[in-house]
Amino acid sequence: MLRTQAARLICNSRVITAKRTFALATRAAAYSRPAARFVKPMITTRGLKQINFGGTVETVYERADWPREKLLDYFKNDTFALIGYGSQGYGQGLNLRDNGLNVIIGVRKDGASWKAAIEDGWVPGKNLFTVEDAIKRGSYVMNLLSDAAQSETWPAIKPLLTKGKTLYFSHGFSPVFKDLTHVEPPKDLDVILVAPKGSGRTVRSLFKEGRGINSSYAVWNDVTGKAHEKAQALAVAIGSGYVYQTTFEREVNSDLYGERGCLMGGIHGMFLAQYDVLRENGHSPSEAFNETVEEATQSLYPLIGKYGMDYMYDACSTTARRGALDWYPIFKNALKPVFQDLYESTKNGTETKRSLEFNSQPDYREKLEKELDTIRNMEIWKVGKEVRKLRPENQ
């Protein structure tokens, strides 16, 4: 009888495996098919494209709406004064330059950012200036300083924003929380925002690969009646693949919320909790790290990024699928109150106040280094360094 049951299980397993293999092959073909069959016609059609995102129709803009020749003509009389050369300044500045637009950098002379800009080919007196000189020369002033630095430098920058210029942000932080930052944009200028959904390094690397990062855009002031098209065009010019409309308020709330949640803080907390429980139950550091971080980042997350979470439920084993289906509602119900508190904390300005207070302290770098050193010395991340060394490509 046991042999008969075992034979049935094996047979059923083979049938399920065969069906799942066929389903995955069909699914994979479905995911890859649009790239070959539908993208090109969409690129060659109208500028406005409406996409149904899970039942909500939104208008998106793509590179096809602003090809390079159109960008060069639209911005032919403009100079982009990019203030700050940190993560976003680096990525957006180099992409603008590679797209053939007239961009200059404004930073503190002889400071670290000045030296970094020179290493990237920016030339003092030609396209590298002090902040004041750059703003005076620019028709677009792209304020890409850190949030704390924007607040500190605003009294010096605001008088330089003369009529006719366009003020640009990549984060809604400063103008939205103006009661805390004291950054109140002039009412007689177009004020726009383009917020890449990733770091400046990613903005640059995806552009160099011929791809593009997703970005949102928003308009604070539309004095000329052209603020929307300015933002859409500039979003493409800095290297966006597609861009969608939001507001300054929604951008800053979703950005702060995401960074503290699934993008950084929340995922780090989940990694630590799972790792700790495994270690407390006798699992080795290597096993705990592999089951918590390595498998997630090297195997599962790339597939989720490429095909979606629904694909993963088809792609995993029957045992993994059953467990995930049973447990994801439990995690959702446990975590949702935390996320609700987090969103309220971003919306009411608590996170902004905390950020400004900490990042404006004269010894904030020393305090930050202590916090980062604590993370570096956590067992989980020490183990991670050793595990990464064992990857074949690192040997």
Swiss-Prot record:
<keyword id="KW-0479">Metal-binding</keyword>
<keyword id="KW-0100">Branched-chain amino acid biosynthesis</keyword>
<keyword id="KW-0521">NADP</keyword>
<dbReference type="InterPro" id="IPR013328">
    <property type="entry name" value="6PGD_dom2"/>
</dbReference>
<feature type="binding site">
    <location>
        <position position="317"/>
    </location>
    <ligand>
        <name>substrate</name>
    </ligand>
</feature>
<dbReference type="GO" id="GO:0009099">
    <property type="term" value="P:L-valine biosynthetic process"/>
</dbReference>
<feature type="binding site">
    <location>
        <begin position="146"/>
        <end position="150"/>
    </location>
    <ligand>
        <name>NADP(+)</name>
    </ligand>
</feature>
<feature type="region of interest" description="Hydrophilic">
    <location>
        <begin position="363"/>
        <end position="395"/>
    </location>
</feature>
<dbReference type="Pfam" id="PF07991">
    <property type="entry name" value="KARI_N"/>
</dbReference>
<comment type="pathway">
    <text>Amino-acid biosynthesis; L-valine biosynthesis; L-valine from pyruvate: step 2/4.</text>
</comment>
<dbReference type="Pfam" id="PF01450">
    <property type="entry name" value="KARI_C"/>
</dbReference>
<dbReference type="GO" id="GO:0042645">
    <property type="term" value="C:mitochondrial nucleoid"/>
</dbReference>
<dbReference type="GO" id="GO:0005739">
    <property type="term" value="C:mitochondrion"/>
</dbReference>
<feature type="binding site">
    <location>
        <begin position="108"/>
        <end position="113"/>
    </location>
    <ligand>
        <name>NADP(+)</name>
    </ligand>
</feature>
<keyword id="KW-0496">Mitochondrion</keyword>
<keyword id="KW-0460">Magnesium</keyword>
<comment type="pathway">
    <text>Amino-acid biosynthesis; L-isoleucine biosynthesis; L-isoleucine from 2-oxobutanoate: step 2/4.</text>
</comment>
<dbReference type="GO" id="GO:0000002">
    <property type="term" value="P:mitochondrial genome maintenance"/>
</dbReference>
<dbReference type="InterPro" id="IPR000506">
    <property type="entry name" value="KARI_C"/>
</dbReference>
<protein>
    <recommendedName>
        <fullName>Ketol-acid reductoisomerase, mitochondrial</fullName>
        <ecNumber>1.1.1.86</ecNumber>
    </recommendedName>
</protein>
<feature type="binding site">
    <location>
        <begin position="84"/>
        <end position="93"/>
    </location>
    <ligand>
        <name>NADP(+)</name>
    </ligand>
</feature>
<dbReference type="GO" id="GO:0003690">
    <property type="term" value="F:double-stranded DNA binding"/>
</dbReference>
<dbReference type="GO" id="GO:0009082">
    <property type="term" value="P:branched-chain amino acid biosynthetic process"/>
</dbReference>
<comment type="similarity">
    <text>Belongs to the ketol-acid reductoisomerase family.</text>
</comment>
<keyword id="KW-0597">Phosphoprotein</keyword>
<dbReference type="InterPro" id="IPR013023">
    <property type="entry name" value="KARI"/>
</dbReference>
<feature type="domain" description="KARI C-terminal knotted">
    <location>
        <begin position="247"/>
        <end position="394"/>
    </location>
</feature>
<dbReference type="GO" id="GO:0046872">
    <property type="term" value="F:metal ion binding"/>
</dbReference>
<keyword id="KW-0560">Oxidoreductase</keyword>
<feature type="binding site">
    <location>
        <position position="291"/>
    </location>
    <ligand>
        <name>Mg(2+) 2</name>
    </ligand>
</feature>
<keyword id="KW-0028">Amino-acid biosynthesis</keyword>
<keyword id="KW-0809">Transit peptide</keyword>
<feature type="transit peptide" description="Mitochondrion">
    <location>
        <begin position="1"/>
        <end position="47"/>
    </location>
</feature>
<dbReference type="InterPro" id="IPR013116">
    <property type="entry name" value="KARI_N"/>
</dbReference>
<feature type="active site">
    <location>
        <position position="171"/>
    </location>
</feature>
<feature type="binding site">
    <location>
        <position position="255"/>
    </location>
    <ligand>
        <name>Mg(2+) 1</name>
    </ligand>
</feature>
<feature type="modified residue" description="Phosphoserine">
    <location>
        <position position="355"/>
    </location>
</feature>
<feature type="domain" description="KARI N-terminal Rossmann">
    <location>
        <begin position="57"/>
        <end position="246"/>
    </location>
</feature>
<feature type="binding site">
    <location>
        <position position="255"/>
    </location>
    <ligand>
        <name>Mg(2+) 2</name>
    </ligand>
</feature>
<dbReference type="GO" id="GO:0009097">
    <property type="term" value="P:isoleucine biosynthetic process"/>
</dbReference>
<dbReference type="InterPro" id="IPR036291">
    <property type="entry name" value="NAD(P)-bd_dom_sf"/>
</dbReference>
<feature type="binding site">
    <location>
        <position position="259"/>
    </location>
    <ligand>
        <name>Mg(2+) 1</name>
    </ligand>
</feature>
